Amino acid sequence: MITLTIFSPTDFQGLRGPLIIYDPEDPQKHLYDVDDESTIFQVGDSWHNSTVPLLAGYVATGIVPVSDSGTVDGAGRFQGGPAVPFAVTNVVKGQRYRLRIINQSARNVFTISIDKHFLTIIEADGVATQPLLVNEIEMLAGQRYSAIVSTPPQLSGSLALELINMAHSFTQTRPLINNAPFVSGDPSRNLNQNATLSRGILRYAGGRREDPRTPMTLGPDPTNPLAFVEANLKPLVNNPPGIPDVNITLNLVVTTGAAQWNVNNVSYLPPVVPTLVKILAGADEPANFNVTENTFLLPVNATIQITFPPMLMTKLTPSTYTEYVTIFLILLHPIDAFPKNNFWVVKSNSSDSDVINTIDPIKRDVTAVGAEGTIVRFTTDNIVMASGTDEVRTDVEPDAAWEGLCPAYDALPSALQ
């Protein structure tokens, strides 16, 4: 039994929140002193426009939208905007805090760092890990990490770090969380975006109530960074994957300048009868699904390996497009095998292309695919009535049914909405 952090992703515009299940018998409880609501950090992205114009612009140009700002516990600033208060976490010297960091973004990738402090990762996506000391953590949308931060008694003064070079200015209010470059989008396309304004505050008892006065940093010593590498994560309790019974290769190709992803040279096209409706009706043969549904049938109680080769970019001009990749992994008894089950990351995109770990790979439920290639394994032994991939949806345009979902709400006076 371990302490579990669950995040339910949603749309660009929607409610976001975590479910924290605390384990009174956490085997790593001796590593920290404080683990409560004050140490939950929900980082996210803020969008001033709705998905409707964002989607229209993406489809027309192929240019990936960029958020207006990053937030910590719902608070953040944008360039030229109001100086809203940053989220503050009050700490006491000499204590060890378990930070539960959750990336609730629709798109943003964040680099998490704390001025003059190391982070010790002990959990990834609800799976306990061997302690891993780092300066910073890169987090994809949907990922969760628990990291311990110590507040040494010798830090009675105040120190600040610049992003690259160490500075010796002094403050007792430290930048807590900083925004990284944004995945698949160019921040210069959104003038509201200023990565240095996406931060929270770790405030020592007795510290002045002021904003951080330093730029982004990557932890205590930028000259000797302890860079975070996903492949270095090891499970606290090892449960190595079995030999795969089924091997699937998914070549993902992004067409530059167009809103199109291809999976094995197939661009997803929505069928007349939705894929999930077919599954719920009992479809369990390849002939029941169109090629453009990207549907794979899997045996029950098997080990599945999916290989994502290094991704390539192409400048082909497509005749059709999709805004997202949907891959249905259908079992003969419909179960949700991927990604709601944790999978072993036997080859992380963070490692060299020839580094494969089948001895003690980390298990998690969100990982990256990209230039180095990724290989995951999972077992089809968790039978539930669902199937398919989870995703943050920006591709669904509102229709009459959507508009009619909340007529009672729309009829309320504006003061009550």
From Swiss-Prot:
Coiled coil: none annotated. One of its GO terms (molecular function) is copper ion binding. It holds the Pfam family Cu-oxidase. Transmembrane segments: none annotated. InterPro entries: Cu-oxidase_2nd, Cu-oxidase_C, Cu-oxidase_fam, Cupredoxin. Belongs to the multicopper oxidase family. Laccase-like protein; part of the gene cluster that mediates the biosynthesis of clavilactone A, a meroterpenoid that features a unique benzo-fused ten-membered carbocyclic ring unit with an alpha,beta-epoxy-gamma-lactone moiety, forming an intriguing 10/5/3 tricyclic nested skeleton. ClaR, ClaS and ClaT are sufficient to produce clavilactone A and the function of claX, if any, has still to be identified. The biosynthesis begins with the prenyltransferase claS that transfers geranyl pyrophosphate (GPP) to hydroquinone to produces geranylhydroquinon. This is Laccase-like protein claX. It comes from Ampulloclitocybe clavipes. The lineage of its organism: Eukaryota, Fungi, Dikarya, Basidiomycota, Agaricomycotina. The gene is claX.
